[in-house]
């Protein structure tokens, strides 16, 4: 019990020092920097030229889908590295666990592929146009309204 407490204690001290370092750096920079805002400092600057249009750029949603899939498989690799270093003593059960883990991710990728989320150029649906309706003959004596 004592050894576990000292191990977690060192992790806690490390986290506490990290938080103190970040907060201390933020507060020090906040106290020491000059703060004199004016309209010219707050204006947009683009290489000496006046800004034209908005700075907001709309990205296609396909970029985000590709980025999310990359992050998912990147995290998978992060989980697989420690497993690969201790694979031999863990045995067959650990191999089955990792295969299930990878299989679930591959099923998700296959679902996204079948759904069409990985198609960069999506086909446009071919909607047939209706032929024009023929004009009906007007009965004799009936008046036509314009």
Swiss-Prot record:
Keywords: Cell inner membrane, Cell membrane, Membrane, NAD, Quinone, Translocase, Transmembrane, Transmembrane helix, Transport. Its main location: membrane. InterPro entries: NAD(P)H_OxRDtase_bac/plastid, NADH_UbQ/plastoQ_OxRdtase_su3, NDAH_ubi_oxred_su3_sf. It is an enzyme of class 7 (translocase). It is found in: Cell inner membrane. It catalyses: a quinone + NADH + 5 H(+)(in) = a quinol + NAD(+) + 4 H(+)(out). GO terms for molecular function: NADH dehydrogenase (ubiquinone) activity; NADH:ubiquinone reductase (non-electrogenic) activity; quinone binding. The chain crosses the membrane at residues 8-28, 63-83, 93-113. The keyword Cell inner membrane applies. The keyword Hydrolase does not apply. Its EC number is 7.1.1.-. NDH-1 shuttles electrons from NADH, via FMN and iron-sulfur (Fe-S) centers, to quinones in the respiratory chain. The immediate electron acceptor for the enzyme in this species is believed to be a menaquinone. Couples the redox reaction to proton translocation (for every two electrons transferred, four hydrogen ions are translocated across the cytoplasmic membrane), and thus conserves the redox energy in a proton gradient. Belongs to the complex I subunit 3 family. This is NADH-quinone oxidoreductase subunit A. It comes from Chlorobium chlorochromatii (strain CaD3). The gene is nuoA.
């Amino acid at each position: 019990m004592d050894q576990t407490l000292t191990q977690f204690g060192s992790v806690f001290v490390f986290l506490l020092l990290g938080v103190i370092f970040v907060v201390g750096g933020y507060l020090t920079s906040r106290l020491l920097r000059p703060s004199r805002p004016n309209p010219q400092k707050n204006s947009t600057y683009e290489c000496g030229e006046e800004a034209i249009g908005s700075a907001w750029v709309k990205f296609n949603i396909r970029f985000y889908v590709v980025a999310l899939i990359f992050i998912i498989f990147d995290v998978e690799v992060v989980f697989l590295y420690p497993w690969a270093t201790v694979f031999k003593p863990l045995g067959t059960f650990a191999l089955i666990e990792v295969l299930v883990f990878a299989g679930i991710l591959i099923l998700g990728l296959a679902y996204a592929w079948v759904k069409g989320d990985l198609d960069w150029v999506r086909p446009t649906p071919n909607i047939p146009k209706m032929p024009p309706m023929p004009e009906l003959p007007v009965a004799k004596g009936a008046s036509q309204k314009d």
